[in-house]
Amino acid sequence: MLEHKPVLLKESLDYLKCKENGIYIDATLGRGGHTEEIIKAINDRGLVIGIDRDHEAIESVKKRLKKYSSLRTVHDNFTNIPFILEQFNIKAVDGMLFDLGVSSPQFDNPERGFSYRKEGPLDMRMDKNQELTAEYIVNNFSHEELTNIFKEYGEERWASRIANFIIKSRQHKPIKTTLQLTTIIKDAIPASARRKGGHPARRTFQALRIATNDELNILKKTINHVVKFLKPGGRICIISFHSLEDRIVKKTFRELARDCVCPPDFPECVCDHKRKLKIITKKPVKPGENEVENNPRARSARLRVAERVLN
């Protein structure tokens, strides 16, 4: 099992510009790597709220970082940040960090169902209290629904063919495990295509994970909802791990950094939209060669940063 290493740690902290007595949100607590460094950058009168959908992550961090009095952990979805802040009676924060994707402990634990290399139940839920699982999707969604998921969330060239093989297979017996699904995907993709582009199941598993957890819809909704809780000058830092996430972050930041979002053919502005953000990173920040060498899972990471402005 790989040790979980926080990605783009120095870059995130540099852009977050943590200050003493500050209030910060780590919206994806994970194993607390970023959180711990934020805590160290503020004094005891500051506050870090760590949020995660995964109860195991929350319990692990509470135990590991129990010596820090400035940490509060919340088992919840980051889309509920407005309600979480209300519970803490906090009106605005100095910064927010989002580290999207699956943590190493989640990915390496076969029982979570994220890995296409290890046998385990076809689960893929970030939050185990959630009802929808990848197993349900694979065994109940129609050919059209599966194809759309694999195309939209996995950018999988063989989406329709994979969906067809899944439906034929589940007619004989339910698809319940990760390696069972991996075998079906391998059979569906032509041999010539399997020899390039990484593991043949990678895109399909990514698509199922995103669909199971509604990751992209939640991401866009959350960015739009939480920026108003940043103090002027406060920053939002988002680390993404694939192009679908990065495009959403880029597009949403751009929309929030514009004064007018009317269609270009409108003769005058009627939207009354006021810019909320200033984009700090014109291009995404990528990990350096040393980080990728020491932590191969950092290779696809992209960091984008924006700053709250006064309307």
From Swiss-Prot:
Keyword Transferase: yes
E.C. no: 2.1.1.199
Keyword annotations from UniProtKB, A to Z: Cytoplasm, Methyltransferase, rRNA processing, S-adenosyl-L-methionine, Transferase
Catalysed conversion reaction: cytidine(1402) in 16S rRNA + S-adenosyl-L-methionine = N(4)-methylcytidine(1402) in 16S rRNA + S-adenosyl-L-homocysteine + H(+)
Major subcellular site: cytoplasm
UniProt-listed GO biological process terms: rRNA base methylation
Location of the protein in the cell: Cytoplasm
Any Pfam family: Methyltransf_5
Disulfide bridge map: none
GO molecular function: rRNA (cytosine-N4-)-methyltransferase activity
GO cellular component: cytoplasm
The keyword Cytoplasm belongs to this UniProt entry's keyword annotation: yes
NCBIfam families xref list: 16S rRNA (cytosine(1402)-N(4))-methyltransferase RsmH
Similarity section: Belongs to the methyltransferase superfamily. RsmH family.
Function: Specifically methylates the N4 position of cytidine in position 1402 (C1402) of 16S rRNA.
Name of the protein in question: Ribosomal RNA small subunit methyltransferase H
Native source species: Halothermothrix orenii (strain H 168 / OCM 544 / DSM 9562)
